[in-house]
Amino acid sequence: MLHPDFLTRPLTHRGLHGLGVPENSMAAFRAAVAQGYGIELDVQPAADGTPLVFHDYGLGRLAGRDGVISALSPAEAGATRLLGTNEAIPTLEAVLGMVAGRAPVLVEIKDQDGSLGPRMGALPGRVAEIVAACHAQGEPVAVMSFNPHAAAGVRAAAPDVPIGLTSCRFDRDDWTGIPEARRAALSRLEDFPRVGASFISHHHQDLGNPPVGRLAAQGVPVLCWTIRSPAEEAAARGVARNITFEGYRPQAG
């Protein structure tokens, strides 16, 4: 089950980032903790499989250079500066060690298959090992992914860690290369019981999706992403029990 903090403390989207504070950086996560918010972050593998906290597959947008995150060693990631600041790409273990249970941390495993298929490599198991150690200490942690195979991998390796599905309409234009039938099944959340999920984080503009409502009626915690204004928050909270946000400051739980 999700720790209660996941339902009471709004989750910063990639930390509390802004001017001079890059997303998914230690500075963004420290700011979130200081303001009483929770944290949502993204995980990609380093060349040796170490879970790194980084959203994109390529380095261009945040590091200003060519290359892919999965080609970096942890040391190279730690020497890669983000958006011209002194902030570098952190490891998941370092972030969780810094937070130390002071805020709920929702870890999103990025797809490694390319089509939300089973080729996730060792990343789910590596994430599970790190997160399970925190969970065993009573720290509020959970893991989710758009890829149900990633969620299932964490569940198999760490059965006590809460897992969820990141979800949306899975529109064709946003999810090219995934067959229509599979996209439809994903939008209907058909994998939810199979993978042993205990929550979802759904796109805020699709909270009226009937499968979302059915899960909510069953008492399944519905979170949502990504809220960018008080008006969007007010609309989302008609269904969602908590939000992932950026660009404004909601009331901290």
Where do the PLM segments sit?
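Phosphate-group recognition and catalysis centered on beta-loop-alpha active-site segments
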Residues: 1-253
